[in-house]
Regions:
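Conserved HGGG/HGGXW glycine-rich cap/lid loop of the alpha/beta-hydrolase fold
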Residues: 26, 30-79
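Residue in the alpha/beta-hydrolase core beta-strand immediately N-terminal to the catalytic nucleophile
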Residues: 73, 109, 132-135
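Conserved acidic catalytic loop of the alpha/beta-hydrolase fold
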Residues: 90-108
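Short beta-strand immediately N-terminal to the catalytic nucleophile in serine-hydrolase-like folds
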Residues: 92, 110-112, 137
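Gly/Ala-rich beta-loop-alpha elbow adjacent to hydrolase catalytic centers
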Residues: 112, 116, 120
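Flexible "cap/lid" loop of the alpha/beta hydrolase fold
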Residues: 125, 132-173
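Conserved serine/cysteine hydrolase catalytic core
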Residues: 202-256, 260, 269
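Catalytic active-site module of serine/aspartate enzymes centered on a nucleophile-bearing elbow/loop
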Residues: 262-296
């Protein structure tokens, strides 16, 4: 085991007693893996680029005490199908609506981290009738500044390096980009992601999705300006924005004008966190989400 990696907070210890189950659904012909737990109003939670459902290991249990928590592996991620598509926000959103249909759910709360937040915003814009309340966690429809593009390019480089060396150390370096303190990252999370990435064809899929995400952040992609800031004004559902004080790629001062366009939004800055506040500061994030969503 490498030094600096904590063994605390194992996935199973976090899940014990919460009734978390792994289910595979047919979502519009795409085999889709979901971790779910709890009863009550549905809460769809979306991970970021290159992620998987275990991203929310510290949130599923606590939130499942109040909601039916649904955490899928996104299209092209984890153990969900990896079709030959462009991986636009439309592709992701359409797949998730198909998943909700397969589960017999018409309307839910939606929360997303990083590109998951962008997808959640896009779902709300496309079909506001299917979203109750929206939570954006370090993900928003807006472009990074020049410094942010450099930081995202660094993440892309770390991702591309997996093609030649998908070792534990390479996976660890990519995960460490996400957190403020690398000691926050557990060895178990590194090993989970290492196993996922070592599926045949998985690294190529992650690189393809990473290219799509960066292309959307840089400008037009597949003929659409998905990250146009003004689209945030089209969000008609109550919105909670959770940002961190050390978010790479899109710091708060850069994206605040986009937040200001949301008609009904409240904002909280999570201290001592980078791109994974739900993992770095789970008690704070779980509490804020619970309070906000229970108002709906």
């Amino acid at each position: 085991m490498s030094s600096g990696i904590s063994e605390s907070g194992s996935v199973w210890l976090e899940f014990m007693g919460s009734g978390v189950k792994e289910t595979f659904y047919d979502a519009g012909g795409r085999r889709t893996r979901v971790l779910e737990a709890g009863a009550g109003q549905p809460l769809l939670i979306l991970h970021g680029t290159g992620g998987h459902a275990e991203t929310y290991q510290r949130n599923i249990g606590p939130l499942s005490q109040h909601f039916h928590v649904i955490v899928p592996d996104l299209l092209g991620h984890g153990f969900t199908d990896r079709p030959e598509v462009d991986y636009t926000l439309d592709d992701f959103a359409d797949h998730l609506f198909a998943l909700l249909d397969a589960m017999g759910i018409h309307r839910s709360h939606v929360s997303g981290e990083s590109i998951g937040g962008c997808i959640a915003a896009w779902m709300t814009i496309k079909h506001p009738d299917r979203v109750d309340r929206l939570v954006l966690n370090t993900g928003i429809l807006d472009r990074p500044d020049e410094k942010g593009l450099v930081q995202l390019a660094d993440l892309e480089k770390r991702t591309q390096s997996l093609r030649d060396d998908c070792s534990l150390d390479t996976v660890r370096r990519r995960l460490e980009w996400l957190v403020l303190d690398r000691d926050t990252m557990t060895e178990e999370m590194v090993r989970i992601r290492h196993r996922i990435y070592n599926q045949p064809g998985m690294v190529d899929s992650v690189i393809r999705v990473m290219h799509a995400v960066l292309s959307m952040n840089r400008g037009l992609y597949c003929g659409h300006d998905y990250m146009a800031r003004e689209r945030m004004a089209e969000i008609s559902r109550p919105t909670l924005v959770l940002w961190s004080d050390h978010n790479p790629g899109k710091p708060f001062d850069v994206i605040k004008p986009a937040i200001d366009l949301i008609p009904d939004a409240e904002v909280h800055i999570i201290k001592d966190a980078a791109h994974w506040p739900q993992f770095e500061q789970p008690d704070m994030v779980n509490g804020l989400m619970r309070q906000f969503l229970l108002r709906g």
